[in-house]
Amino acid sequence: LHNTLRRQRQMCIRDRDIQIKTSLEGEHNIKNILSSFVTHYCLDNNINNFALKLNSNKIKNVRQIKSKWLKGSTLIDDTYNANPDSSKKSIDLLSKYKENTILVIGDMLELGKFKKKLHREVGEYAKAKGINVVLGYGKLAKEITEAFGRKGIFFNNEDSLKSYLKKNITSKDVILIKGSRGMKMERF
């Protein structure tokens, strides 16, 4: 499986190329498509049917939607929900960009007694993956920015984060926004 054009992938199965279209970003989503293909192939054994069904299916855009944003920057909107694993997958995606990478992250809710530790792990992971800046919003996101270090900035209110983004974002930035549903991160 490899990328061909924007939002298109090409699969080579049994010496046949199949064009598929998907709005989904990230290696983990491509793996999900491949596992769906294997299931479909075992049940139907018609390679072309899978591509037709996938290409005609409108996947509800709620995860990792890529678009142009403030001042010509690139936005990856992954505001639908967050947990430690999905946040790390999003960080993996963001880390593949060569541009200046900015993670805007809100609290990951409903994590129980290990919530602070799990938030810190996400900050450490972002640092290890080479993310340039982490902007945190929410009480628990402070753990992420502290674990990230010097270029981790915590915001305790919506207006200060919005103001920072408007003032500091450039066309060379790739910004990924992520947070639990309850944080309503899409407002940024």
Positions of PLM-derived features:
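Single conserved hydrophobic/aromatic residue that forms the stacking wall/gate
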Residues: 1-13
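Structural motif
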Residues: 13-15, 17-21, 70
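Conserved catalytic-core segments of large NTP-driven translation/proteostasis enzymes
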Residues: 7, 15, 31-34
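ATP-dependent carboxylate-amine ligase
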Residues: 23-28, 34-188
